[in-house]
């Protein structure tokens, strides 16, 4: 890997990366033959997208990825070699297919993550710890789907990573979904978690129809030990919740082209702000030691920018739309997009 100097404030881990193949079509007709106007290909995965976004903003964030050794040219071919650290494992790289219609409608078909052997996963854990130590990183982002172990079919364990990061005084941000989201949410092992409204509703087992519902659901995660919950609410913007504070933020409406990767952009935006603007002596540390409201405001700006771009990874973080931060959210405000919490 090239382009890294010691001293990256953030390291990312994408446990199950994917080759994102996007077909651009005028209108998708189900059950018929459709012709693609164009096809794009990029190496993707939530942690990769976070690293790519931070890299664009001038924040070094090396990304660790266990990657199938059957496609050795993929890093160079997708222009990802500069900021990714591959750990070559047996097998192929999974493919995610996105069909993007002219009107902005997005259809996505994701392959299941490739299972890993215990040895391969242990090597991922070791490389993660080594990289965080060498970089002197303050944050580790674990993002995306989790693979399972080849022999048992159980999800790989993040506990050794959380234990090591806790030992090193490194903060962790976790963005995953499904059963692992529920499990690790209840463990309270991560410093920051970033569920969307549907995931949060599923996690607490009830519908979320107001901003207050979202905040009280997030407080359940705070109660388990999660320091900050960043809940993305689609058109309703985003809230950040700690045990003592809650903020909401949004931007003016933007023209939506592609929603895939918007959540990753918000997490990258949050982290770019908190590492670039550390709390100074005498300033409010919001009870956590980093500037959560600034991070939240930046998160919605980056997320709004991401949905106006055709790829799942950010291509630019210049000309950001204005962000509006609400220091006292209205708990009774109805969500434009209520969350039912039904599993997908």
Model-identified regions with their sequence ranges:
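Positively charged, low-complexity intrinsically disordered leader regions
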Residues: 1-29
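Hydrophobic anchor at the start of a short beta-strand
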Residues: 10, 60-62, 83-85, 172, ...
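Substrate-binding N-lobe of the ribokinase-like
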Residues: 35-94
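Short beta-strand scaffold segments in enzyme catalytic cores
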Residues: 52, 95-99, 237-241
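Conserved phosphate-binding/catalytic loop of the ribokinase/pfkB sugar-kinase fold
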Residues: 88, 98-136
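Short acidic, glycine-rich surface-loop motifs adjacent to enzyme active sites
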Residues: 131-151
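Conserved phosphate/ATP/ADP-binding segment of small-molecule kinases
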Residues: 155-244
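Conserved phosphate-binding/catalytic region of the ribokinase-like
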Residues: 211-344
């Amino acid at each position: 890997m090239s382009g890294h100097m010691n001293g990256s404030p953030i390291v990312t881990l994408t446990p199950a990366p994917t080759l994102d193949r996007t077909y651009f079509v005028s209108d998708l007709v189900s059950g018929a033959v459709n012709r693609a106007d164009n096809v794009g290909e990029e190496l993707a995965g939530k942690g990769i997208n976070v690293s790519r976004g931070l890299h664009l903003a001038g924040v070094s964030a090396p990304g660790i990825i266990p990657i199938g050794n059957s496609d050795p040219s993929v890093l160079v071919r997708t222009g990802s070699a500069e900021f990714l650290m591959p750990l070559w494992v047996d097998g192929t790289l999974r493919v995610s297919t996105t069909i993007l219609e002219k009107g902005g409608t997005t259809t996505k078909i994701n392959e299941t993550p490739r299972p890993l052997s215990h040895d391969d996963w242990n090597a991922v854990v070791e490389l993660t710890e080594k990289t965080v130590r060498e970089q002197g990183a303050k944050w580790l982002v674990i993002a995306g789907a989790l693979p399972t172990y080849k022999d048992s079919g159980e999800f790989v364990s993040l506990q050794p990573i959380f234990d090591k990061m806790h030992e090193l005084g490194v903060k962790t941000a976790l963005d995953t979904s499904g059963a692992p989201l529920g499990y690790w949410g209840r463990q309270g092992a991560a410093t920051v978690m970033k569920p969307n409204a549907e995931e949060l509703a599923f996690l607490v087992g009830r519908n979320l129809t107001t901003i207050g519902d979202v905040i009280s659901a997030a407080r359940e995660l705070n109660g388990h030990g999660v320091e900050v919950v960043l809940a993305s609410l689609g058109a309703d913007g985003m809230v950040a919740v700690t045990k003592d504070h809650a903020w909401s933020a949004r931007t003016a409406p933007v023209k939506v082209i592609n929603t895939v990767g918007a959540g990753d952009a918000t997490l990258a935006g949050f982290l770019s702000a908190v590492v670039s603007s550390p709390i100074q002596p005498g300033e409010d540390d919001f009870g956590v030691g980093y500037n959560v409201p600034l991070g939240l405001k930046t998160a919605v700006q980056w997320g709004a920018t991401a949905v106006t771009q055709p790829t799942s990874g950010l291509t630019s973080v210049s000309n950001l739309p204005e962000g509006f931060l609400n220091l006292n959210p209205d708990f009774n405000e109805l969500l434009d997009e209520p969350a039912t919490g039904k599993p997908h």
